[in-house]
Amino acid sequence: MRIRVKICGITRLEDAMAAVQHGADAIGFILWPQSERYISPEEAGRIVKCLPPFVRAVGVYVNPDKSWVEETSATAGLDLLQFHGDESADFCSRFHLPYIKAVRVRDGLDLLQYAQHYAGARGLLLDAYTAGIPGGTGHVFDWKLIPAELPLPWILSGGLHPGNITDAIGQTHLSAIDVSSGVEVAKGIKDVNKISAFMQRVRSCEDVRSS
């Protein structure tokens, strides 16, 4: 099975094109103004217009107002919403676009119950827990905390980079990945060599799986 990859925290057209060139399935835009990787919806929209067909544009939000999601998703031309804060399942379902719900994984969190609560989500994004920080920390969580049978599709995130992605795939049997800081030279600035190395390792793991 092909592993789907989203490269998140894109702020520049050249980085989006590098991600696409190396096989990314989705591009993520941080539409939370407090983030160091924030991009305006207008600039995100200019990048989205350059994406080829079937590469999805994902907007990342943290506890937004409904009007902010509606306005920015339309301006940017998004395909998918990703909620990374404390948004309720009811709030996430209020929009005309499908959504992913991020969850910061830690000991004591019942992921099965969480998945049932957000049953309307397209999937769960599993990220590392760091107190007071919604995501993008570059930290890895204990992958053994992922249940064998989650009732929703899930995406592995949190501290992934070319040096650990092979282990991540081997240990979790994932089918989708979200990477941001692991392919950067600075916050919001991607490194084409790191993108290339990351994607090469992902595809090599696919080859091993299919052999």
UniProtKB/Swiss-Prot annotation:
InterPro entries according to UniProt: Aldolase_TIM, PRAI_dom, RibuloseP-bd_barrel, TrpF_fam
Annotated catalysed reactions: N-(5-phospho-beta-D-ribosyl)anthranilate = 1-(2-carboxyphenylamino)-1-deoxy-D-ribulose 5-phosphate
GO biological process, one term: L-tryptophan biosynthetic process
GO terms, molecular function: phosphoribosylanthranilate isomerase activity
Pathway assignment: Amino-acid biosynthesis; L-tryptophan biosynthesis; L-tryptophan from chorismate: step 3/5
Keyword set, alphabetical order: Amino-acid biosynthesis, Aromatic amino acid biosynthesis, Isomerase, Tryptophan biosynthesis
Pfam families assigned to the protein according to its UniProt record, in alphabetical order: PRAI (PF00697)
CDD domains assigned: PRAI (cd00405)
EC number: 5.3.1.24
Enzyme class at the top of the EC tree: isomerase
Family that this chain belongs to: Belongs to the TrpF family.
HAMAP family documented for this protein: PRAI
Protein name: N-(5'-phosphoribosyl)anthranilate isomerase
Organism (species): Nitrosomonas europaea (strain ATCC 19718 / CIP 103999 / KCTC 2705 / NBRC 14298)
Gene for this chain: trpF
